[in-house]
Amino acid sequence: MGNHALLSASSSHRWLNCPPSARLGENYEDKGSDFAAEGTDAHSLCEHKLKTALGIPSEDPTENLSWYNEEMEECASGYATYVLELLAEAKKVTTDPIVLIEQRLDYSKYVESGFGTGDCVLIADGTLNIVDYKHGKGVEVSADHNPQMMLYALGALEIFDALYDIDTVTMTIYQPRRSNVSTYTVSTAELLEWAETVLKPTAELAFKGEGEFHCGEWCQFCKAKADCRERARANLALAAYDFAEPPLLTDEEVEEVLAKVDDLVSWANDIKEYALQAAISGKAWNGWKVGEGRSNRKYTDERLVAAAVIAAGHDPYEQKLLGITEMQKTLGKVKFDEILGRFITKPQGKPTLVPMSDKRPAMNTAKNDFMEENIDE
């Protein structure tokens, strides 16, 4: 993957909304995560699968992938198949489409020292298609006005626009673990206008560490999220509602709290984790100490435990059906659907409040049920 730029495409959603956060994050250690490591492995496998499918020599990375499993294999194969489908469509309009894999894309014309890596770049008949693989399953990622994808597209235009006279840019997110394929298409002219009027001036502020701090859902990916003063100010302002009983709040106030309460909870948890790690490292917080958390009993040696129980005349094991996820990993998705598809059902989920922008359909509430019953009568 290489080194990341200060104003990387992957972090652009954050620094475009909060320009000073880019420089602020330089003061913090760059800690990796299991999710990032898993994503890196998945990208390596995707690259290999796609190269192999295109007849490009590639060394199988599987034995060196710490997070490799059956699911990752299926996801990477699906990604390669999807790109081949795009290529087949491209060949209907041009005889020689261009396919580039893990292409370095330089967008420094608009962003100081800006560069990134495009998973797949496809060019055919005046159309540029950027495909980005996402292995995460926590948050569904949309390609619509996605700044990371738009930066990649700008980098690709710098290389190929003069050669191929590109007038249309399509950006695609392929996120198999969320069954999500999101596509956004924009004219080259519109993309370049955004680059000049929005991206370039904001990037200049971000590179200098200037501009205004702004809190939002992008804070979750900021290194300074735990002790950022602006985030604290915004969340403490919301916490003031705690001094009034909920029945005394107006509907508008409740709606305002609902829109921000997840950020408040996230911020509070970030503060607790930051303070704990600092205390473990030796920092003293007035009125606080590091205590031992709850723990559960465990066997020191399961093999010896089993032998002892068997010797006492008892069976130490339970026979239990594999869960759906483990069963699918064991059988593989195709066989799982073929053998067990008719035995699988998904009950209705527990009601939860979500914004109207959420893609899930609204559930029937007691009021809706009552209204429907009256209509039927």
Q: What positions do the PLM features span?
A:
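Metal-dependent nuclease catalytic cores that hydrolyze phosphodiester bonds in DNA/RNA
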Residues: 1-128, 168-170, 182, 261
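Short amphipathic alpha-helical segments and their helix-coil junctions
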Residues: 17-30, 130, 138, 200-207, ...
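Short, charged, low-complexity amphipathic alpha-helix
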Residues: 196-263, 361, 365-377
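Extended, charge-rich alpha-helical segments
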Residues: 266-377
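Active-site-proximal structural scaffolding
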Residues: 113, 145, 215, 254-260, ...
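Hydrophobic/aromatic-lined pockets within catalytic cores
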Residues: 50-54, 135-138, 153-161, 204-207, ...
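Mg2+/Mn2+-dependent nuclease catalytic core
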Residues: 95-204
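Alpha-helix N-cap/helix-initiation motif
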Residues: 31, 35, 140-142, 250
